[in-house]
Swiss-Prot record:
Name of the molecule in the record: Small ribosomal subunit protein uS17
A GO molecular function held by the record: structural constituent of ribosome
Gene3D superfamilies: Nucleic acid-binding proteins
Protein family: Belongs to the universal ribosomal protein uS17 family.
Lineage summary: Bacteria, Pseudomonadati, Chlorobiota, Chlorobiia, Chlorobiales
Any one cellular-component term (Gene Ontology): cytosolic small ribosomal subunit
Length: 89
């Protein structure tokens, strides 16, 4: 008999800018998204701040980074740094 293994989906990923790197092995990124107002239909920006696990303290303030979700690492951290897309100037 052949057993079938359920296929899991891909993990979510976000791209954002580092706004704080003052913690050890962690940083905070801001992810912007465009949302449409339900009544007036105008688009506006909303910002979400994510706390990210940065094992080697690679990211600095102003860097553009890509993060992926992972298991909860602490009360507020459930993402880890995947790559630094662009370093700050």
């Amino acid at each position: 008999m052949e057993q079938t293994v359920p296929v899991r989906g891909r993990k979510k990923s976000w791209t954002g800018k580092v706004v704080s790197d003052k913690m050890d092995k962690a940083c905070v990124i801001a992810v912007e998204r465009r949302v449409q107002h339900p009544v007036y239909k105008k688009y506006f920006k909303k910002t979400t701040r994510l706390m990210v696990h940065d094992e080697n303290n690679e990211a600095g303030v102003g860097d553009l980074v890509r993060v992926v979700e992972c298991r909860p690492l602490s009360k507020r951290k459930s993402c880890r740094l995947a790559e630094i897309v662009e370093k700050a100037k």
